[in-house]
Amino acid sequence: MNTLGIGVDLVEVSRVDAIIADKGARVFERLLTPAEREYCESRPDPATHVAVRLAAKEAVFKALQGSSSATESALGIGWKEIEVTRNPDGRPDIVLVGTAANRAAALGVKRILLSLSHTHVAAVAVALLVGADGD
């Protein structure tokens, strides 16, 4: 396995709760895809699931950023270009589109390993970019 990048992020659930209380869940329309919003809204504790998705997106961005000091906007990667999905066995997965997918291809990414965890206090995500052996 050839590791091309790693990213980690932590989001406090209380911050997401406060944003929802202040501005409503619609504030996340610019950050989450329709499928992500639908999933989060279907859960008993939407803020926790929003928080873990935001952490996952940021972890993937950090991994894609690599040694570059560029920000998301400088790389041209939008929040909705990194989507957290679930594979058939229920494990979290990542789908990249647009600039995010182009960046991954340019780095030689063949697979993104994602680990998510959350409590009622915090959500954490770790993303590992994997290239082909020998890259």
Listing of model-derived features with the role each one plays in the protein:
Residues 1-135:
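Core catalytic alpha/beta fold that binds nucleotide/phospho-ligands
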